[in-house]
Amino acid sequence: MANERRNLIRWLLSGGLTASILSFLYPVIKFVMPLAVPEAAVNEVAAGKVQDLRPHSAKIVKFGSRPVLLIRVNETEWKAFSAICTHLNCTVQFQEPRQQIWCACHNGFYDLNGKVVSGPPPRPLEEFIVRLRGDEVVVTKQT
């Protein structure tokens, strides 16, 4: 009888310990190895009207399921880059006073050509093509 009780207690404790370990490991594994989300077959998006974005400013637009940083460099020049930092996939933002792209996660900076200026990002941002169609701004994938 005492032996059966010990076995039951051992079984319950090992089951509880296993459940505790799995409840900790599951979110860690999901974070480290996220599910692959199929990329939407989008080749271009209408990003808004020319007059919606003043010179020396930027906004983030959706390109399928990915964010793209659209920058109006001056009256006539436009740039667009992936808004995903090449270091750890944080969302980047445009710093108007410095005229640079900044990743707040680890203080990485990119210039207006998407090239790394400082910080930990290992490679430049992916660039997109910007075209004007009348008063509409259109962002297209590089081929």
Regions found by a protein language model. Name each.
Residues 1-9:
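Twin-arginine (Tat) signal peptide motif
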Residues 10-86, 90-97, 124-143:
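N-terminal pre-ligand scaffold of iron-sulfur
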Residues 99-107, 117-126:
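Short cysteine/histidine-rich metal-coordination sites, predominantly Zn2+-binding motifs
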Residues 108-110, 130:
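Active-site and channel-lining beta-strand-loop segments
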